[in-house]
Amino acid sequence: MRTNSTTSGPGVPTLEKKNLGRIAQIIGPVLDVAFPPGKMPNIYNALIVTGQDTTGQPINVTCEVQQLLGNNRVRAVAMSATDGLMRGMEVIDTGAPLSVPVGGATLGRIFNVLGEPVDNLGPVDTRTTSPIHRSAPAFTQLDTKLSIFETGIKVVDLLAPYRRGGKIGLFGGAGVGKTVLIMELINNIAKAHGGVSVFGGVGERTREGNDLYMEMKESGVINEQNIAESKVALVYGQMNEPPGARMRVGLTALTMAEYFRDVNEQDVLLFIDNILRFVQAGSEVSALLGRMPSAVGYQPTLSTEMGSLQERITSTKEGSITSIQAVYVPADDLTDPAPATTFAHLDATTVLSRGLAAKGIYPAVDPLDSTSTMLQPRIVGEEHYEIAQRVKQTLQRYKELQDIIAILGLDELSEEDRLTVARARKIERFLSQPFFVAEVFTGSPGKYVGLAETIRGFQLIFSGELDGLPEQAFYLVGNIDEVTAKAMNLEMESKLKK
């Protein structure tokens, strides 16, 4: 892995004023810069504009070269606000792409797209940096072992299991619980696996980023007393930042994760929230650069940009990067080019349903729409596969019967169908689960349920032993033993009321 050991600051290699240009034009976050003949910077080189604005305030803006225009001009996209910049200002070509700090010193810290710490905890204690633009690992370096990554969330582990070193997409519209599910996964994985995580906040709400940071401090994932014991590095390029920053912040987070995989030889978790904002930022930049839009107004380079990010997220013989990506689905339309392009790269999809969220079933994971390439008997075993298929068949039959129930009522169903409906409603509720990160809001303590416990629970439901229990007993519990305990409590309460 290519790293630099000398820098003058996180985002920029050592500056030697050998290649200077001047700003010729400014259009929002896009700068046209004129350089002397024969001194043109390369595509993706970092350019730095320093100086003072009209009020005497210092200016330090980093840009990235995107196009060579001819006539000794380049077009670059700024990574921060361009307020105060003027034509004629001096621009320094750093001669290299953006580089960010990597290694153990990044854990417990919050960075921006340039790799500068933004948490007011002082400079990062590392001299090792790495460029954010790299090629994906060669075929000969890839690892092809298939193993399950247990999350402790029943519906995920049973019906759409995650692959260790795979790519997982969380699909859902606005407000169905993507970010809460990501926070729960970070919490469970840090506690159960002791793994290192990198979180890339791409174009999401600043408030959510702040909430996540506070939540991590409370749960001990970030250790304030001893920052070196923290389990996660955070990289934010939020909604209020220019499109250049939002387009590149995913690469900054990925570069930090790659170092843990390639040099430290660790298994790493990379969370990206939200991959659609990465696409949207690319679309904005594409329009600013004057490219003709493609389908639904997206950039013509959508597949290429997505591929350059996704192909670097993989397992090598040194270690693995397991990536969990939230994918906002515009207007709940899964055929939109952005989610459709993302689908092609994923090993598992966790689809969040507005219908389940409206019923109050959380996590609102749709058991029929969520998929995984890992759900095969040779990988998960016959027992797991059989139970998962029975759960899906029961829920599918319930879905088919809902129209009949709505028109004619339950009484018109056959005895067999009535039993199917009763069990399906219990399964639906048993797939809900109290989360550790939602304890503050729900008042229920979070539950981590191992895969073996989950399978045992559904076996008991299908055996008929629990047919007499009320369906409320299955709602927001951990394992099946809690269901019987809750049913007894409900029975006691109803007797006391009488």
Swiss-Prot record:
Source organism superkingdom: Eukaryota
EC class: translocase
Coarse class of the protein's main subcellular location: plastid
UniProtKB keywords: ATP synthesis, ATP-binding, CF(1), Chloroplast, Hydrogen ion transport, Ion transport, Membrane, Nucleotide-binding, Plastid, Thylakoid, Translocase, Transport
Binding site for ATP: G172, G173, A174, G175, V176, G177, K178, T179
Annotated function: Produces ATP from ADP in the presence of a proton gradient across the membrane. The catalytic sites are hosted primarily by the beta subunits.
Annotated GO biological process: proton motive force-driven mitochondrial ATP synthesis
Compartments, as annotated in UniProt: Plastid, Chloroplast thylakoid membrane
HAMAP family, sorted: ATP_synth_beta_bact
Protein name in UniProt: ATP synthase subunit beta, chloroplastic
Organism taxonomic ancestry: Eukaryota, Viridiplantae, Streptophyta, Embryophyta, Tracheophyta
Enzyme Commission number(s) of this protein: 7.1.2.2
Reaction equation(s) it catalyzes: ATP + H2O + 4 H(+)(in) = ADP + phosphate + 5 H(+)(out)
Similarity field: Belongs to the ATPase alpha/beta chains family.
Keyword Thylakoid in annotation: yes
Natural source organism: Beta vulgaris
PROSITE patterns referenced in this protein's UniProt entry, alphabetically: ATPASE_ALPHA_BETA
Subunit comment: F-type ATPases have 2 components, CF(1) - the catalytic core - and CF(0) - the membrane proton channel. CF(1) has five subunits: alpha(3), beta(3), gamma(1), delta(1), epsilon(1). CF(0) has four main subunits: a(1), b(1), b'(1) and c(9-12).
Disulfide bonds: none
GO molecular function ontology, one term from the record: ATP hydrolysis activity
